[in-house]
Amino acid sequence: EERLRGLLDIPVLHDDQHGTAVVVAAALMNACEVAGKQPEDIAITICGAGSAAVSTARMLNSMGIDKKHIVMVDSKGVINTQRTDLNSIKSEFATERRIGTLQEAMNGADAFIGLSRGNLLEEKEIMAMKERPVIFALANPTPEISYSRAKSIRPDAIVATGRSDAPNQ
């Protein structure tokens, strides 16, 4: 993408990155309205640190959600300032909080945005979230947690997946 931007004099849209970011941002704004939460005040855990996750975090930041309210988790744990293995892109979203695990990142989170791998969210992590949590389990083809499982654990949750067979795609 960066190379194309340097070569071309037209806008470049990377669908997997920017398309995902736009849809997630719009859905999150709507979910906040339904849940009675102010977007700029919510704590967000983003699971995944690939291009879609980074673009989503950047989009949310551009919409007024401070980076300090976003905790990003990759396959090695929370992306924080204590880690020495971060590239410049991951460093952009490194939290200063001294937490290391997904479980710790989910403690008190208002929203979970999953852009990682399937079946990684457990009941304890969902239960650690605030009232009326927003859970976007978007890994495909298998979400981080299924719609039905998330709703059975937290009936108060606003849940979306990328699955067309789920009621809230």
Language-model segments: what does each one mean?
Residues 18, 22-113:
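Glycine-rich phosphate/diphosphate-binding loop of Rossmann-like nucleotide-binding domains
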Residues 7-9, 41, 106-109, 129-131:
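Short, well-ordered loop/turn elements at secondary-structure boundaries
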Residues 60, 116, 140:
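Short, flexible active-site loop motifs that bind/organize anionic cofactors or intermediates
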Residues 1-19:
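Pre-Walker A segment
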Residues 2-8, 119-169:
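Rossmann-fold NAD(P)-binding glycine/threonine-rich loop
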Residues 9-10, 87-93, 156-157:
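Active-site regions of enzymes building and remodeling cell-envelope glycoconjugates
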Residues 12-15, 46, 72, 113-114, ...:
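General beta-strand structural signal in soluble alpha/beta enzymes
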Residues 17-18, 84, 98, 126, ...:
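Short capping/connector residues at structural and topological boundaries
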